[in-house]
């Protein structure tokens, strides 16, 4: 079933499979990189997370012998969480950061030299990057899977635990454990690409082992 879904996702945007690895005018990349480094400050979904997503998405696609449009992937990976940060954050208004990010990403890309014809593909990848959503097209698929896998394994633990409020606010220790348990239960089945699926068992095992050790060492989390 997952293989069928994978093929459908790719076939809906087959034209981009043969896209050039990147445009010759790549100066916009440094603009985007600097923008992300300056504005995205968060231990769980900040600049370093964007860098990891870009690299992992490329690695997964290469393992699956799928050619991506690297312009689209780079822009989407580095900017996919932009609406989780001020002044673009509208979560309090009930607007999901993925939807808002897709809507406003052109405000960063326009005027940088980024190929304007590719902005809609960037919007598409950003809109569906979260693991609960269904990506359409190769760049969207591999960004989606990279973003999902970044919630598992040791890095997934590090991201969630970094969110714990040191002053007793939320999330506290127990809430962080619940987030990790939810990720363990929900994320693995949402990784769709063949290469991504191959990485799931080890990362799943690492996260499960951490939770088991933590449970044992804190009397069932009661001493967190």
What are these model-predicted stretches?
Residues 39-51, 55-66, 79, 131-224:
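Divalent metal-dependent phosphate-bond-processing catalytic cores, especially two-metal-ion Mg2+/Mn2+ enzymes
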Residues 25-33, 50:
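Onset of an N-terminal alpha helix
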Residues 4-16:
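Bacterial N-terminal signal peptides
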Residues 18-22:
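Boundary at the C-terminal end of the N-terminal hydrophobic targeting segment
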Residues 112-116:
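Inter-helical turn/loop segments and adjacent helix faces that build the functional surface
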């Amino acid at each position: 079933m997952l293989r069928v879904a994978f093929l459908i996702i790719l076939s809906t945007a087959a034209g981009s499979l043969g896209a050039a690895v990147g445009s010759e005018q790549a100066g916009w990349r440094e603009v985007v990189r600097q923008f992300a480094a300056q504005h995205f400050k968060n231990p769980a979904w900040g600049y370093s997370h964007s860098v990891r997503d870009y690299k992992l998405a490329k690695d997964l696609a290469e393992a699956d012998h799928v050619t991506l449009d690297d312009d689209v992937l780079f822009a989407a990976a580095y900017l996919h969480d932009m609406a989780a940060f001020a002044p673009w954050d509208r979560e309090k208004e009930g607007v999901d950061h993925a939807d808002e990010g897709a809507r406003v990403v052109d405000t960063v890309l326009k005027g940088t030299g980024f190929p304007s014809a590719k902005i809609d593909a960037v919007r598409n990848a950003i809109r569906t990057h979260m693991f609960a959503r269904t990506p359409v097209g190769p760049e969207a698929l591999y960004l989606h899977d990279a973003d999902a896998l970044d919630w598992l394994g040791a890095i997934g633990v590090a991201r969630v635990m970094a969110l714990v409020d040191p002053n007793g606010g939320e999330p506290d220790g127990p809430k962080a454990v619940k987030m990790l348990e939810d990720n363990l239960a929900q994320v693995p089945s949402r990784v769709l690409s063949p290469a991504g699926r191959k990485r799931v068992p080890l990362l799943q095992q690492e996260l499960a082992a951490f939770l088991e050790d933590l449970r044992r060492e804190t009397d069932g989390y009661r001493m967190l």
